[in-house]
Structure formats: C-alpha cells, structure tokens
C-alpha cells in the first residue's frame, strides 16, 4: 500500500460513515452571533460562554499591549519571551485561584500533554475518567506509565483502582465540566479518595472556570476543594486562547525544568497576556454575566423538555441533544442553519458510536429571543 492509498481509504471510510470533518469559514460577531458567506447566524456552537471575545475592554487591552510590546513574544519564555505582562497574569491567576504559582501555556492541549510527559515514569499509573479529554488520553498513550480509565464520574470505581497496588506514583485526572455531555464531576468525592503522598489530583476545568463558583473561580471552588494541579483554559469563558496550570511552587519549578511543551514553544504574545488580565477583571466582577448565562440555560432547558430527543442532564452552558445516527445529526444541524441557528453536529470518534449529537452551547451574550428562536427551530426540525 502506498501513502496515498492509505490516506484515500481513510477518507473514503470517513465519508461513508458521515464522519468526515470539514472546516467552515466563519466571522465572529457581537451578540453571540457569527457571519458565514454574508449571512448572520445565531451561534450556538462556540465556547464564548460570557461573550468576552467581543468585549471592548479586552480589545482595548490587546491593542494597548500591542502598542507597548509588539504583536509577538519573539521567543520561548525560557529565552527572552517572558515579559512583565506574562508575570503579572500568572501572579493574578495564582492569587485568584489560591495557588502558589501559575504557568502559562499556548493551549490546554499542550498543558495536559506537558504534565503527563514531565511527571510520569514507567512504574507510575494514571487513573483517568473514561470521558477525559483527548489531550490527556493521547499523552497517556505515549507515556511509560500505565493508564487505567474508571467509569465516568464513578468515584467508587476510582476508589477500587486506587486500592490496587502500584509500584510507583499515581496521577488521578478528571474534568470539572465534561465538554461533550456538559455534566460535572463529583469533585468533592474524588478529592476525598485521591489523597496521600503518592497520589496527585489534577482537574481540567476548561469549561467551569469563569462561569461557576465565587468570582467565577470554577468547579473546584463550588466543590470546596483545591487539587494538586488545576488547568484553566482561556478559549472558553475568557474569550481568548491559551491556558494556565495552577500548582505549588516546587511543582512549578520542576515543570519549568522538564515540561518540553513549555520550554520549546514560543510564549504567547505579551499583548494577549494584557487582554487576559483584562478578561480576569471582567470575570471576577462578572456576577451579572453569570446570572444572565444561568437564566439562558434555564430558559432553554424548560423549552426543550418536550423535544423528541434526549436532552443531556446538564446544568451548564453545554446542552447536548442526543440524536443517534451521524446522518440524522447532520440533517438536523442543517435544518437549524436554514432557520438562522448555527449548530454543529458532533459525531464519533469524538463521542461514542450511536450517540451523535447537537452540542448546543449557550452564552451570556444570547438574548431571550435568541433562545426562543433556537427552540422554535428545534421543534420545526424534529417534525
């Protein structure tokens, strides 16, 4: 077989199963919207939960940062790419979330990969929720450590795995809010189980931080816990991109020596760090935004209760509607777009076979009429 034959066969298989991914050119717009080919749509497919990607304070902070620092960092943070803007953001994040230190990464994917690669050795084990993010699972598959996945949100299953002997150390990994189902982990139970000098607890709170807890401190604040490692990402509630890992001072110093994704990547632009600092201020003062998002979630769930589809048990901004077959999910998504609602069908392998879904996401930027328009389009599309 040639390389071309292998690639062609893989693409044909994806096409036949209605699982071929294609990108679509979109332009973000204010008010929880986007523009595609000159047409404005209500956007229910993004992760801009508080609408901050269009916030004037963030835009102004980025512009001012670019005037001060330029548009790129020009180097790894280990060389000359670490500015006072980066340091200020790290310090503010650590203070806000109650940790010694914060380390900035170019993405949450890179941060998860870096932690696993830097920490895990052959005698160690990773105990991860079965629905953990692909970044963690991919890193674990390349790690010399043993990966064991426990049943989703099943703290008893985790306890059983922890009860088994291990020659080395253990990393327990879960998420605050799961990206495809929108449900929350039983963090208090998991933290109570994952204790001891030989166990680290890491929580990826990409979809919880900013929208849950006091001042938006996230899922761990709601649960009243502080994990050993906390990942927050900036592509959701913060409205930008990048990520930060919160940890102890010794852990931060260790990762600065060993985390290759951090050492060998160009640092995020200082202007971006300025915008992220502005986003943090808006988030900490954003109770009104979080209340608006909560009202939108409640309005949607009340209206969607009678739909002839399975509505996932989620109280978060992620509201999945389980359709089943790939083709049916694609057809329904297209019907919604015809009604001016931009919705994306999520298909295997991102979700299990037979559970293709519309992953609806709500934002504080949406108004009542946006939610009502989505509900009307869903009822019409299901006829």
Swiss-Prot record:
Names of required cofactors: pyridoxal 5'-phosphate
Key words of the record: Biotin biosynthesis, Pyridoxal phosphate, Transferase
Summary of subunit composition and partner proteins: Homodimer.
Organism in which the protein naturally occurs: Cronobacter sakazakii (strain ATCC BAA-894)
Keyword Disulfide bond: no
Listed PROSITE patterns: AA_TRANSFER_CLASS_2
Residues in coiled coil: none
Name of the protein: 8-amino-7-oxononanoate synthase
GO term, biological process aspect, one: biotin biosynthetic process
Modified-residue entries (N6-(pyridoxal phosphate)lysine), positions: 236
InterPro entries: Aminotrans_II_pyridoxalP_BS, Aminotransferase_I/II_large, AON_synthase_class-II, AONS_Archaea/Proteobacteria, AONS_Proteobacteria, PyrdxlP-dep_Trfase, PyrdxlP-dep_Trfase_major, PyrdxlP-dep_Trfase_small
Pathway(s): Cofactor biosynthesis; biotin biosynthesis
Pfam families in the record: Aminotran_1_2 (PF00155)
Ligand binding (substrate): 21, 133, 350
Enzyme class: transferase
């Amino acid at each position: 077989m040639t390389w071309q034959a292998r690639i062609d066969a893989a693409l044909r298989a994806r096409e036949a199963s209605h699982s071929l991914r294609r990108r679509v050119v979109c332009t973000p717009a204010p008010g929880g919207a986007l523009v595609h080919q000159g047409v404005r749509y209500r956007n229910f497919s993004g992760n801009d939960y508080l609408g901050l990607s269009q916030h004037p304070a963030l835009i102004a902070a980025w512009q001012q940062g670019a005037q001060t620092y330029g548009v790129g960092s020009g180097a790894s943070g280990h060389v000359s790419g670490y500015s006072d803007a980066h340091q200020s953001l790290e310090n503010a994040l650590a203070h806000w979330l109650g940790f010694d230190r914060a380390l900035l990464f170019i993405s949450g994917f890179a941060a998860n990969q870096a932690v696993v690669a830097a920490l895990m050795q052959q005698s160690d084990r990773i105990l991860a929720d079965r629905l953990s993010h692909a970044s963690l699972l991919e890193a674990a598959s390349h790690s010399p450590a043993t990966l064991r996945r426990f049943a989703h949100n099943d703290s008893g299953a985790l306890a059983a795995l922890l009860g088994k002997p291990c020659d080395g150390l253990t990393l327990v990994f879960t998420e605050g809010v799961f990206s495809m189902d929108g449900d929350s982990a039983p963090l208090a139970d998991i933290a109570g189980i994952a204790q001891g000098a030989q166990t680290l607890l890491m929580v990826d709170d990409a979809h919880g931080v900013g929208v849950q807890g006091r001042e938006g401190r996230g899922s761990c604040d709601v649960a009243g816990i502080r994990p050993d490692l906390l990942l927050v990402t900036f592509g959701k509630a913060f409205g930008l991109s990048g990520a930060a890992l919160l940890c102890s001072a010794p852990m931060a110093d260790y990762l600065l020596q060993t985390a290759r994704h951090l050492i060998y990547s160009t640092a995020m632009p200082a202007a971006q760090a300025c915008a992220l600092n502005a986003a943090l201020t808006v988030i900490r003062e954003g109770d009104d935004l979080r209340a608006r998002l909560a009202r939108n979630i409640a309005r949607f769930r009340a209206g969607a209760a009678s739909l002839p589809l399975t509505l996932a048990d989620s109280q978060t901004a992620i509201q999945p509607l389980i359709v089943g077959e790939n083709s049916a999910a694609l057809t329904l998504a297209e019907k919604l777009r015809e009604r001016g609602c931009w919705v994306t069908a999520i298909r295997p392998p991102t979700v299990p076979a037979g559970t293709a879904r519309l992953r609806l996401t709500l934002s504080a930027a949406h108004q009542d009429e946006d939610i009502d328009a989505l509900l009307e389009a869903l009822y019409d599309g299901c006829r």
